[in-house]
Amino acid sequence: MTDDDPVGGAMAVTDAFLDSFNACDAAAHAATLAYPHVRLASGRLRLWQDAADALPAMEQGMTALRERAGWHHSEWDHRRAIHAGPAKVHLDVQFTRYREDGSVIGHYPAVYVIVREGDRWLIAARSSFAP
């Protein structure tokens, strides 16, 4: 990826985002986000000022998802650039959550806003239909 490839940067950070989520690595997951970070899901707006603010919610969410739904992993169904500029990309995404036996928990469309901060691409905001 080069500075001239904003969509490539957005894809790389969203790969790291999902890989760290699947590994239940909250610290690595938090490192893929820009702060302050906005998440709109389950009818709630969450604003995390920094990684220390996000980590407890991420750890709790990962644990609850495993216990409540039997979640094992998630996969991207698609990631499509809606708009792309030199420092910001809007992605139309959808992911599916799976149980260990491969059965589907649900499909969740979302919009992600990816920004470049210095030489890094990070997820600044997410609006999804995921619980």
Which ranges hold each PLM region?
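A solvent-exposed, acidic/Ser-Thr-rich amphipathic alpha-helical stretch
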Residues: 27-79, 87
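Short, well-ordered beta-strand segments in beta-rich or mixed alpha/beta enzyme
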Residues: 17, 38-43, 88-97
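Short beta-strand segments enriched in hydrophobic/aromatic residues
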Residues: 33-34, 95-97, 127-128
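Hydrophobic/aromatic beta-strand elements that line small-molecule binding cavities or substrate pockets
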Residues: 76-82, 94-97, 109-115
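Short beta-strand edge/turn micro-motifs at domain boundaries
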Residues: 105-131
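Residue-level signal for tight coil/turn positions that link beta-strands
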Residues: 86-88, 118
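Short, low-complexity N-terminal intrinsically disordered segments enriched in polar/charged residues
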Residues: 1-35, 40
